[in-house]
Amino acid sequence: MNAKEHFIATEAKVDEAAIAPLPNSRKIYVEGSRPDIRVPMREIRQSDTPASFGAEPNPPIFVYDCSGPYTDPAAKIDIRSGLPALRAGWIAERGDTEQLADLSSEYGRQRAADPRLDELRFPGLHRKPLRARAGANVTQMHYARRGIVTPEMEYIAIRENLRRKDYLESLLAAGPTGQKMAALLTRQHPGQNFGAAIPNEITPEFVRDEVARGRAIIPANINHPETEPMIIGRNFLVKINANIGNSALGSSIAEEVDKMTWSIRWGGDTVMDLSTGKNIHETREWIIRNSPVPIGTVPIYQALEKVDGKAEDLTWEIFRDTLIEQAEQGVDYFTIHAGVLLRYIPLTANRMTGIVSRGGSIMAKWCLAHHKESFLYTHFEDICEIMKAYDVAFSLGDGLRPGSIYDANDEAQLGELKTLGELTDIAWKHDVQVMIEGPGHVPLHMIKENMDLQLEQCKEAPFYTLGPLTTDIAPGYDHITSGIGAATIGWYGTAMLCYVTPKEHLGLPNKQDVKEGIITYKLAAHAADLAKGHPGAQIRDNALSKARFEFRWEDQFNLGLDPDKAKEFHDETLPKESAKVAHFCSMCGPHFCSMKITQDVRDFAAQQGVDEAEALQKGMEVKAVEFVKSGAEVYRNV
């Protein structure tokens, strides 16, 4: 074993940078109808408005928080022990699961029995895996269709609302100042939601109904009780996914756990472990036991490792064992490329970039080697039986997505999409949750066609897209080329956006790349929420704009998506503490700040007892008299 891998098992420590609370923020918990429903949010405290701007208190702002216990100073974090099993009681009280005596997966048992892996193994609590009792179905969709509102659904409703109703009522009850603040913070431009059904308030019953219809999913494997329930759907806040994972060329278990904790700190709603290197099973165990967000995988990657990378040697039996292995570890959703059909493969021959999906290319090679449809397609109902025994959601993979804008919206891509719609119907027959993966590389004017076709052919199952990248000319900046497409398709109705880092197409991302990708995609998701008119989406923008106008620099930093970078950029040119209260920044300096000039006009108006328009006119008249008295010279000697 190498030193890094030995270290992770014996002396593993959490990344200190990932557990510090964000500046001027604290974790709060909102209790539901029972004491074990405690929903986390982040409260950002603000300073008072300076006397020169009216001297008024500014209320805290509440934002969605994906970081789990990591940013709670009261939590004891030890990644060797893992996180508390938040959902264990909810799962047990339903009475439809059984604890297995041992792992069901042959490969899982082999790994557990191999003493050479002891140095790598997660040392914390090893729970016996759970599985649905014979004849039972344990999916959130199954409960929803039976009219059951689960604790997970109530948790999600509280989480999505972000205390907005109570917050508004408390402001209105605080007298004239609070009423003014309520009007200012809650002002929001009407959006265009393209036929979505976003309510003013999310209720547990609304969550249940959306899951029952298949318009939203709750990724929550019964073997991942550590996860904090979240929802992916068109009528909820737009979510983002962060990809992590080792490769044959680098990274270690320690680095991947650090990437996970780093991802959720900055706002990753889910994390996909796309490991293709060594010790995939052990890496995944460490990640899941320490993750408060849903974990997704592409099981065919690990199955391929089991046959030494030879796609043609893959079998249904190997893949089935891999699904069970990962389901019993607690993976919450599987990307499965079951829509890559034999007849679609020739349609990629004239593409500029062919088949760019790893999973898609693996299955295409298998189909051609055996000249028949893939076992993912022919055994799809068997896969559904596994999914509903553990509540693993499908993320139906777009194995034929375009890898260049040249190939966008071609026959292969859209043919596969139609097949994914047909597979969705089969999964729903089993009450298995489904989301649909989407492109890819698509120029801006062709994005809406993708969204419209997906809604039509996949019956409004949540869409989950990689970008899309809107141009191919910017290697090193593909977080931006894709962020443009992500904001656009999120506005049109995509439920979750898969981040792209600056390293896309170039290399394995490091921690800084992960952060860049997440911040870019949080920005895209928020822009989409604003454009859709999602209730309350503009509160944070209004608070930050007010702080900016009042030169409350620290509040500006703290209300932003990345307080550290905002402060760093400000302090590059104005590092002194006095600059944190200055009425200007280094862009315009003290005499040309537009906001300072506007405030001067307001002060002048107040002194003169007139409105701002009259103040501007009076000011112009005063300056005209000064000009004439000084000799009416355009240029003066100074």
UniProtKB/Swiss-Prot annotation:
[4Fe-4S] cluster binds at C585, C588, C593. Keywords: 4Fe-4S, Iron, Iron-sulfur, Lyase, Metal-binding, S-adenosyl-L-methionine, Thiamine biosynthesis, Zinc. It holds the Pfam family ThiC_Rad_SAM. Pathway: Cofactor biosynthesis; thiamine diphosphate biosynthesis. Its cofactor is [4Fe-4S] cluster. Its EC number is 4.1.99.17. One of its GO terms (biological process) is thiamine diphosphate biosynthetic process. It catalyses: 5-amino-1-(5-phospho-beta-D-ribosyl)imidazole + S-adenosyl-L-methionine = 4-amino-2-methyl-5-(phosphooxymethyl)pyrimidine + CO + 5'-deoxyadenosine + formate + L-methionine + 3 H(+). Substrate binds at N243, M272, Y301, H337, S357, R358, G359, D398, G399, L400, R401, E437, Y464. One of its GO terms (molecular function) is carbon-carbon lyase activity. The keyword Cytoplasm does not apply. Zn(2+) binds at H441, H505. GO terms for cellular component: cytosol. It comes from the Bacteria. Homodimer. Belongs to the ThiC family. This is Phosphomethylpyrimidine synthase. It comes from Azoarcus sp. (strain BH72).
